[in-house]
Amino acid sequence: MTERVQVGGLQVAKVLFDFVNNEAIPGTGVSADTFWTGAEAVINDLAPKNKALLAKRDELQAKIDGWHQARAGQAHDAAAYKAFLEEIGYLLPEAEDFQAGTQNVDDEIARMAGPQLVVPVMNARFALNASNARWGSLYDALYGTDVISEEGGAEKGKGYNKVRGDKVIAFARAFLDEAAPLESGSHVDATSYSVKNGALVVALKNGSETGLKNAGQFLAFQGDAAKPQAVLLKHNGLHFEIQIDPSSPVGQTDAAGVKDVLMEAALTTIMDCEDSVAAVDADDKVVIYRNWLGLMKGDLAEEVSKGGSTFTRTMNPDRVYTRADGSELTLHGRSLLFVRNVGHLMTNDAILDKDGNEVPEGIQDGLFTSLIAIHDLNGNTSRKNSRTGSVYIVKPKMHGPEEAAFTNELFGRVEDVLGLPRNTLKVGIMDEERRTTVNLKACIKAAKDRVVFINTGFLDRTGDEIHTSMEAGAVVRKGAMKSEKWIGAYENNNVDVGLATGLQGKAQIGKGMWAMPDLMAAMLEQKIGHPLAGANTAWVPSPTAATLHALHYHKVDVFARQAELAKRTPASVDDILTIPLAPNTNWTAEEIKNEVDNNAQGILGYVVRWIDQGVGCSKVPDINDVGLMEDRATLRISSQLLANWLRHGVISQEQVVESLKRMAVVVDRQNASDPSYRPMAPNFDDNVAFQAALELVVEGTRQPNGYTEPVLHRRRREFKAKNGL
């Protein structure tokens, strides 16, 4: 039973009340009385509005279901369908033209282009690694991944392999020649780097000296000008550093003593309270808020054991250099942090309102993450985040402009409680629900003075695509979804609308996640598509991936690319509304079995860690043992696809159960090396995780918008109660 404290009309879990009063509030200049009184007013006023918005979602979905049911067996009439969506208020008239008015935005968001990490803030180690991923070793990223092949004696091995190391050095020199070309010759032939008369001087093998083709790319150095330890260069708005140490193991093998190239990598990171965490009660929420507090105060630390030794990981300091004129240059040492609050759907029993109801979790997150961010705003931190006095909050899973307007209202109310200037709280709008996509311009307009980010989330968006049209018929296989007409239009529409509403220079236009953290050669080949599509940020699964993805922003001048794209014909809403129905469902029995098994295995691999271990984001081996980053968004697709096929008779419930049981054995085998893992087989009936996975599919048509949170939260609480956690 949760111990509670009565605060006005609110019943607050004691663990949360104590954290807020004893840890979060001191140093903010906000009194506890002011905060709790204001919080209660916000909850009393806005919780009913939140509830009404959710009812509107259900009402629209019921109407869409009914429309399709009434036309079962008929060919889809796209024109009639569009007219129907307009009639029920799903598809709204296009908003009048406007320009975003966001002010006081940090350069990492407004004027730079580069990778973005998303990490569960519940995990302090992941949070610290991401914060520190602003700068990453190119040599390590190349040496430790499949970007450099192991052919020709270049195996990774246990010790340093010079054959592999030489390949890394050659790759890095080629990058230097591309990003910072010399006036004559090549970085490959460099024998020394020095600073003379305010310029970078590069000595070459043939005895000559040269400089940069564009001398302005050299910004500063560390150490002695004649023999610098580091040389700082800039290209396409991104910094990188040639690190020099002839006495180091790698530097000894390099003609110029270069030991590494340090890349400016994860410009921004989303500290996630949402899809990548498993937080179901007050205890869990306090873990999240406490880690966010550590990030905002700059004192988050974690004991890390590696290679037999233990050390304390902390947030990196800023990087300090000497300019050619002798003055000091300081660059931000850490990724600029967003915090992703939860959406409007879930409630959490951390607070009960005056009627004893759980309070919407999104309202709680808005209040607490903003309160905590005051430590950064007022300088009560050793590691500054925003230098422009802003707090960056990503708001996910909003359906249409009314919900965006509600977020704008919530943020205004929170600012008033905390005594913050209007529009201090900025918003990142996830374009990951169909009703937001087709009304994106109006959604941005509803928060036009706060918006700092729009981002396509292909995974959740596909889940909503399937659920919205659940009654229309059987959808295509998961692997075919990316080549459906709607998705290309969706991705282009996000860029088109973002540019048309003046986000360039004020906000990020982002793209989604590379979900295969071990396949970095493939990422390096393919993910350049995101900056080419006009995105000035895109998601990566690890600091190493951020370092490698940064290379793409040196190849593509995103802001110039956006200027080109602004001239194209905007994406068509008719294309976006094209339902991804299978032209026929005459797949072979083997194809159906493979699709069901693949989805069942992914569902179980993720759900078992969520329910049993409280892990909301992990690298889950797929059916072919390829590690895939899974979070609730991937779960939403897999469960909704199987629910759709079940609904339309492509598969039977018996097939689903049989596949889940077979795949549970596979997942148990894949997790056999984890001492804390609890096998699902053979006791399926009593295994909470297995039953949760089954429920997500069998009850998938009845889940609100296809979301997985209601089942996951209830089942995780069941598991915790059953095991005394």
UniProtKB/Swiss-Prot annotation:
The protein's GO terms of the molecular function aspect are: magnesium ion binding; malate synthase activity
Report residues binding acetyl-CoA.
118, 125-126, 276, 313, 541
The catalytic activity of this protein is classed by the Enzyme Commission as 2.3.3.9
Predominant place of localization: cytoplasm
Q: Which domain of life is it from?
A: Bacteria
Q: Which Gene3D superfamilies match?
A: Malate synthase, domain 3 (3.20.20.360), Malate synthase, domain III (1.20.1220.12)
Q: Which reaction does it catalyse?
A: glyoxylate + acetyl-CoA + H2O = (S)-malate + CoA + H(+)
Binding locations of Mg(2+): 432, 460
**Location in the cell:** Cytoplasm
Output the GO biological process annotations, alphabetical, semicolon-separated. Answer: glyoxylate catabolic process; glyoxylate cycle; tricarboxylic acid cycle
Pfam families attached to this UniProt entry: MS_C, MS_N, MS_TIM-barrel, MSG_insertion
Q: Which UniProt keywords apply?
A: Cytoplasm, Glyoxylate bypass, Magnesium, Metal-binding, Oxidation, Transferase, Tricarboxylic acid cycle
Q: Which cofactor does it need?
A: Mg(2+)
Keyword Magnesium attributed: yes
Q: How does it assemble?
A: Monomer.
As for family, the record states: Belongs to the malate synthase family. GlcB subfamily.
**By its UniProt entry, which NCBIfam families does this protein fall under?**
malate_syn_G, PRK02999.1
Query: What protein name applies here?
Result: Malate synthase G
What is the native source organism of this protein? Pseudomonas aeruginosa (strain LESB58)
